[in-house]
Amino acid sequence: MRRALLLAAVVLAGCGSPPPDLFLVTRSGPDPAANLTMLVSDGGSVTCNGKEHPLDADRLLTARQLQRDLAKQAELGIQLPQGANGELAYKVRMEAGSLTFGDESAQIPKTFLRLAAFTADVTEHVCKIER
């Protein structure tokens, strides 16, 4: 009986906790629509500039993979300067650490480009922010 009560207490303690965040992207650029704060939650939602939207399963799986793929680079705190012709700057925070880069950074890793593409896709198609 005591064991059952302990198990029930452990299960209930986890109930009601919000799902963890996967990552936070802050994007800045020359026009108002370029400036964005996007928080992706493991619970299947994304918050763009303070407004929450549901995130479909495919995009959620993509976000989870991006988090895994970017973890080592975030742990290192990689900061790539913006290139001469760049427009958009990205700051990414996640549990593993943070990273910064620009859309025209030299020697930009493919994972950073995938994150930029994911951000553009979610911003336009989920959050309905046209750039």
Predicted ranges, named:
Residues 34-61:
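Post-signal-peptide N-terminal segment of Sec-exported extracytoplasmic proteins
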Residues 1-4:
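Positively charged n-region of N-terminal signal peptides that target proteins for export
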Residues 16-22, 26, 73, 77-131:
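Short, well-ordered, aromatic-rich surface patches in folded extracellular/luminal domains
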Residues 32, 55-58, 103, 107-110:
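Extracytoplasmic/periplasmic, Sec-exported soluble proteins
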Residues 31-37, 85-87:
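Short, surface-exposed coil-to-beta transition loops
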Residues 51-81:
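Mature extracytoplasmic domains of secretory-pathway proteins
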Residues 12-14:
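C-terminal motif of bacterial Sec signal peptides marking the signal peptidase cleavage site
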